[in-house]
Structures are given as C-alpha cells and as structure tokens.
Amino acid sequence: MRRILMIVFLALAGHVSNGQQLSGIELIMRLEGVDSPEDLDPYDVERLESLLNRPLRINHASLSKLKEAGLLSHYQAVSLIDYRSRHGDVLSYSELSAVDGFGADFVERIAPFI
C-alpha cells in the first residue's frame, strides 16, 4: 500500500494539471477504467508511467513490442501491423481510430501513451 501511494504521489508531482490537462495518474486511471488510484496495480502504474515518458512508436514497433507494451490486445496489434503493411504509417489519431479493432474512444484513451 505504501508503495502504490508513493507511486501515485510521484506521478502527481511529475505532471502539471491546469484544469484542462489530466495528470499522469488520471490518464492511467482512465485507461485502466478505475475510479481510485488504490485500484491500480503498481506494476501497471510503472509500465504506463514509462510509456508516458517514452511513448510507444506504433509506426515502428514490432508485433511483440506492441503486445509487450500492454496497451493493445493481440487482435489490435495484428490489425495495426496489417494496416501498416497495406497503407503505410498511421498519420493521425483519426486514422488510427479507423483501423479494425480500434475506435475513437479507445484511441483517445491510449493517445498519451503512443
């Protein structure tokens, strides 16, 4: 419990919130679909904080890297690889939301991590 509270504190301290922007922990909570920081797994918080600092490069990542990041299901990762091979790089969030298995709501939640 102490560890998660420390992680939450550090995450909140590291991100400035101006009323419009969500903090790192708020972005993680939204992605994970939880209402409270205590409901987050500390491992997931560390992994996702790392992605906030070094976003996943979806146009360059291999299938294994896409799956390893933990943002996409196997189906979504395969679908993205297939899309890239047929159409080239994904150039916008709206283009990504058109990839099979994605959608505007999902892309909005993962956008800070990619």
PLM regions: where:
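Amphipathic, charged-and-aliphatic alpha-helical interface segments
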Residues: P42-L91, I110-F113
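Long, solvent-exposed N-terminal ectodomains/accessory regions
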Residues: E38-D39, V107
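Hydrophobic or amphipathic alpha-helical targeting/insertion segments
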Residues: S92-E108
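Structured, non-catalytic alpha/beta "coupling" segments that mediate domain-domain communication
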Residues: R30-P37
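Sec-dependent N-terminal signal peptides
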Residues: I4-A13
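Boundary of Sec targeting at the N-terminus
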Residues: G19-Q20
